[in-house]
C-alpha cells in the first residue's frame, strides 16, 4: 500500500507544480481568453488534487 501512497503523493506534487506554473502564466498574459482557460485548468487541477489527497 505504501507504494500507492507514494505514487499519489508524487502525482499531487506534480499537479501542485502545474497549478503554480499556470498561475505564473496568468500573471504574464493580458489575453482574457487565455486567462479564462488557465483559471479553468487550475480549478480542475485543484479538484484532482483534492480527490487524490483522499488516498494519501
Where are the model-predicted features located?
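A short hydrophobic/aromatic micro-motif that marks alpha-helical segments and, especially, helix-coil
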Residues: 31, 45-46
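N-terminal acidic leader/helix
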Residues: 1-32, 51-55
